[in-house]
Amino acid sequence: MSRTTIHPRAIDAIADLLTDGMTICVGGFGLCGIPERLIDAMAEHGARDLTIVSNNAGIDNVGLGKLLRSRQIRKIVASYVGENKEFERQYLSGELEVEFCPQGTLAERCRAGGAGIPGFYTKTGVGTLVADGKELKEFDGQTYILERGIRADLAIIKGWKADASGNMIFRKTARNFNQTMAAAGQVCVAEVEEIAAVGSLDKDNIHLPGVYVDRLVQGDHYDKPIEFRTIRERSAA
């Protein structure tokens, strides 16, 4: 029997899980595949002093930008944050703690945490500020940094379709960090655009098994914004 529970609204799926000071892994890459409705629910709930683990920090008033605007985030662990002016303001003023992490290292830290691996060594960041305060070890004449796996209190992710048992399908590049973040959370809450009957999805196309999904909600009103819309000149088409 599936342990995945289906909830009518995002706030119903997440409200009793949120507490001040918790660590939350958030899926998505830029604005692609972000759990928009669950982020809205977090803003509505008002939990504060959060540590957010995410590849990006959203943009102003979109995605995690909403939680930055409402001052709910105390610390962000991310690899790229350059498109959010409110993030910039809070970081430069000392209001926001930031841990910069190379993108591949961030993905592996979350994957390791989800797999029960406490840490791993990597050459990425040796000789840079990324290595500051971390254990260094030499293997075969090469220096490596010890990076710790990330295990969060909660993971929130976004998928395209799921069946009622939580087996999920992502749409193209919207898969991004969502799979990895799901396993890194003690509890995973997923939002999808469509919930289908158990057995109706092609088993060979399941990207995330339902064993990783504790709670499921069907979202609505997705704007699917494009961070940078670039088109060719008509003459070049």
Role assignments for model-derived ranges:
Residues M1-A237:
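Conserved alpha/beta enzyme-core scaffold
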